Amino acid sequence: MNNKSGFTSWISPSNIALVKYWGKKENQIPINPSISFTLKNCNSKTKVTYSQSNKGFNYEFFFHGEKKKSFNKKIDTFFKRIIQYCPSLNHLSLKIESENTFPHSSGIASSASAFSSLSLCIYEIEKMINENEKDFFNQSSIISRLGSGSASRSIYGPVAVWGKTKHFENSSDDYAIPVNNYHKIFNNYMDTILIVDHEKKDVSSSHGHELMNTHIFKVDRVNKAHENIGDLKKSLISGDLESFIHIVEQEALMLSLIHISEPTRRSM
């Protein structure tokens, strides 16, 4: 083993889905593909300091300089899932320091930026210690997914696809891929975020995904998402804004209807 102690730091953006994944299988596998724009100014910065541990894996987590044990359950689950990809963790002690440029759990995908930045740190440590030759960003996307599904897309940008679909070659349920073929008009697109409530939302995204598994519109939603991915790809390439706006608005309205239909839940 080399580089048994040190630190690394990464900044990773949140993202906004144009076609959203809603509903998942075991191990964070989506029931439908999704495509997103990254939000470069809504980001998480994570620093991980590591050292050799004689007592097995352990960590401390700090959010904006304060210990946040309320996040430990999600982080514990994340580390259990990724240990097969990052065996060096078995012999490490970590100090994780994270901060956001925007509120967490308020409707912006803070888990996407948080877990993607953490995953980039963790996999960089793995590569330094075990001299892993696997593709860095691909593997980072895989382990990001195991923390938060949408985090897999935050590894890439400005446009990324996650989920197997016939419309994008090499797409996968396990990781996101970058989308490089899009019209230059989208280079100047910006996202305006108005925060009217800093409080944590009533229903978590994770619980919302669980509800989708038994939703009466599940099959229709999955089929429509696949169709919209294909149509949106055409709009992105051609720069057809009328079509682009129609598809994205249709997606927003469809997800809103799903949220307020049976079973009744509010998770936006």
Short names for language-model regions:
Residues 19-25, 34, 38-42, 105, ...:
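Surface-exposed loop/turn and secondary-structure junction residues enriched for glycine/proline
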Residues 1-106, 120-137:
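ATP-binding N-lobe of GHMP and related small-molecule kinases
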Residues 135-259:
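ATP-dependent small-molecule kinase catalytic core of the GHMP/sugar-kinase superfamily
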Residues 258-268:
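Single conserved hydrophobic/aromatic residue that forms the stacking wall/gate
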Residues 31, 249, 264-266:
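Intrinsic disorder/low-complexity segments
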